[in-house]
């Protein structure tokens, strides 16, 4: 962006001037500078000057649209500019700046718009501008062709498109119509698309050159000399100046992206989207097939279970039938009466045999001496009667054998008398029986 050099002392205008974005951080800093709630205008002016100087040091060329160019009057003075001053501005350009060339935009082509440099900035920022090519609009594109016929205003504001917009708000609306372009080192594609859309929709359009349909090559100052910016039209070729560089460098730094490249990129994005949709559709069909197979497998498993149950039932029936046949073959050819008589005789024989065995055992036991018990089994204790009862307590005997030890006898007596008869006095309570 460029500043128009005026003989009057330069002042930073506290308004929403158009500053091309040099990135996200630069835009945020510009928004902080143009804070409408700030009360100290001198501080904001100093911040604005420092911000613009920082942009210049980084290699960018900021353009400040003065209030006279936007509104038709000066914000520093109350008196509007005279007609002679306006004519002097339009007729006599500054000596330090290069002559402005009108650029014609042919149908279906977009080109870079050149920016004139002021004399003060042409010395310090030419080396940095060789790296960062600017894509700012000319101030002449914002002015009408008939500046002499207009009374005080130089930009035709479309009031019918924006009803109810006051003059103080018109600058922001114009900036919305003209989308600010980014530098080509950041995003050339986005800048070309936004320029094409903004020039197609906005009522403010670039003037066309009179007479010659071919656009003149705009020139740009670099450290090596003048360099012509290429503008491609139907059948136009590359032009070279005195200090031109190679064709590849000119195409990379100066030529803008045409609509064919934009269309090719759009077609590529559409193709990618179609492929993505196709892949999604394939995955959906695969999932549907898997679900259908699972549904088909469930009835097959149920049929197999039913067949296994039928086979089991048949096997059980066969076993029952075989048992019934075996029972029938055993009782074939024998009357029922004979079976009952035989069974009765057998029962009688068994009963007589058991009686004889018992008698033999009793006779044998009489001749033998009685067997001694191996253990002294204590009898269960009687129920303890209270003091009110007059029934005497029955005596209990403890049978002692040679095999019984002293501890066993003591345990038996303890169970009967409920007294601890051990030689050692135990202080712990007795265990329940």
From Swiss-Prot:
Composition skew (Basic residues), residue ranges: 216-230, 288-306
Ranges where the record places region Disordered: 204-256, 284-310, 325-396
Coiled coil: 260-330
Residues bearing the modification Phosphoserine: 125
The UniProt record lists the keyword Lyase: no
Keyword Kinase: no
Keywords per UniProt: Coiled coil, Phosphoprotein
Protein name per its UniProtKB record: Coiled-coil domain-containing protein 71
